[in-house]
Amino acid sequence: MKREHKLEHEDMSSGSGKSGVCWEDDGGGMDELLAVVGYKVKSSDMAEVAQKLEQLEQAMMGNNFHDHDESTIAQHLSNDTVHYNPSDISNWLQTMLSNFDPQPNNPSVNSDDNDLNAIPGKAIYAADEFTSRKRVKRNESVTVTTESTTTRPIMVVETQEKGIRLVHSLMACAEAVEQNNLKMAEALVKQIGYLAVSQEGAMRKVATYFAEGLARRIYGVFPQHSVSDSLQIHFYETCPNLKFAHFTANQAILEAFQGKSSVHVIDFSINQGMQWPALMQALALRPGGPPAFRLTGIGPPASDNSDHLQQVGWRLAQFAQTIHVQFEYRGFVANSLADLDASMLELRSPETESVAVNSVFELHKLNARPGALEKVFSVIRQIRPEIVTVVEQEANHNGPAFLDRFTESLHYYSTLFDSLEGSSVEPQDKAMSEVYLGKQICNVVACEGTDRVERHETLNQWRNRFNSAGFSPVHLGSNAFKQASMLLALFAGGDGYKVEENDGCLMLGWHTRPLIATSAWKLAAANSVVVSH
């Protein structure tokens, strides 16, 4: 815990088989990089191969999508005119992975080409050198022909086939990483870069971020886990995920505060405070007038050492003043929620003030440190809130096996990138949202130990954790379901988004894949005894 800020205002706010087509070798020395994806090429020929791959990459106009400069990314996306059913990528990926057998073939660093797991493909390469005259046609497939005075073979590189090989290469690289076969993993991650340039839209971007995560893990260059507020704001504007999270949590809190004259929200994830103006507005419209509203906002230190929590408080206070809500605010800077202690929160008796605890995309980070989540559960029990609202990603990225985590995250983030492609938003917002998600991908793939904080778990896993910690579920009513559905109807490009009720919880999904889940909890009867402070 580093510091706190307090602000009060009386009236204020806020294949497995080898490919049948290969380049023959007349003398040993196969190159591992191409052999691993089904081709036999002599090391002495690699200069020619590299030249041809570079020519092919240029012909396909592939761009490595990972420039964090906003104007560059926005310009790139504004020129991307690919249109498709946005559900196709994730469904196609599901099919590809279901046909992929990740069982190890016992590769080792010293394996020869016969030990490598070949990835099936049907790209046919001309045996002779490229001539200077070529024709390239961009369509569902790319056809390149060479012209000369003699008849030459035709090189056909189908985008779909390269997409299949891309997915298989990603999986094979992850398997090599899990087996600590870094030589093969390095070869594969380079091949992924070549294959990604042939893809369009979401698949290229997803593959690029996963390739970055794999490369960082292989070479030991680990990313810093720091997501700027500006990236999150772009994500908020681009897709309904955070809007859904805030709306459903606020609805549960509003119902829990019904008839209360003084209320206190403890927000474990204050960020820019974007969640709370809507709740204060709803409280202001309550029959009989609004209650006194106290907000405690908890957040990490700012990367620029600015007093950002105080700034959030002032903005909320100004809003509260315009709607005539009595407002009090305190901000706590904490490196981890596990640093919290109930005595810091200036809790008042339940007879005079009702408390709600809110956490949006925060609790999963505690899984990185043994005992941290249990410590926070203990603090919540001491707070004795009327309700605890929790929003988390609906994914399991916290398993012990790297390959399982990689596969699950590839499915999950492919769906998220699909949803971004399907939205009608400003290119800059979409580009920055992709960077926001890309940072998560790199953390899931590249990091381990306490550095791996994106340890998402499913709703069922969180149910087990809360039940074991002495909490019982609070069902989110049909009213919240209907209003959340209306929210999506108002969101541009929201046709692919779905709201589902799951045993009293609400899930937001893209087509058939759930993305996030909102749940609400209260102390079980046995844990409702009064604790003096």
Swiss-Prot record:
Ubiquitinated. Upon GA application it is ubiquitinated, leading to its subsequent degradation. A motif (VHIID) lies at residues 263-267. Residues 157-522 form the GRAS domain. Residues 311-343 are annotated as: Leucine repeat II (LRII). Transmembrane segments: none annotated. Residues 1-24 are annotated as: Disordered. One of its GO terms (molecular function) is DNA-binding transcription factor activity. Residues 1-12 have a biased composition (Basic and acidic residues). Residues 446-522 are annotated as: SAW. Keywords: Gibberellin signaling pathway, Nucleus, Transcription, Transcription regulation, Ubl conjugation. One of its GO terms (cellular component) is nucleus. Residues 355-443 are annotated as: PFYRE. The keyword Transcription applies. One of its GO terms (biological process) is cellular response to phosphate starvation. A motif (LXXLL motif) lies at residues 363-367. Coiled coil: none annotated. Its main location: nucleus. Residues 166-203 are annotated as: Required for possible homodimerization. Disruption phenotype: The double mutant della1/della2 exhibit slender shoots, early flowering and reduced root fresh weight. Impaired arbuscule formation during arbuscular mycorrhizal (AM) symbiosis with AM fungi (e.g. Glomus versiforme) in plant missing both DELLA1 and DELLA2 associated with a reduced expression of AM genes (e.g. NSP1, NSP2, PT4 and LEC5); these phenotypes are phenocopied by treatment with gibberellic acid (GA). Probable transcriptional regulator that acts as a repressor of the gibberellin (GA) signaling pathway. Probably acts by participating in large multiprotein complexes that repress transcription of GA-inducible genes. Upon GA application, it is degraded by the proteasome, allowing the GA signaling pathway. Together with DELLA1, required to enable arbuscule development during arbuscular mycorrhizal (AM) symbiosis with AM fungi (e.g. Glomus versiforme) via the regulation of RAM1 which, in turn, regulates various AM genes (e.g. NSP1, NSP2, PT4, LEC5, RAM2, EXO70I, STR and RAD1). May be a homodimer. The DELLA motif is required for its GA-induced degradation. Belongs to the GRAS family. DELLA subfamily. This is DELLA protein 2. It comes from Medicago truncatula. The gene is DELLA2.
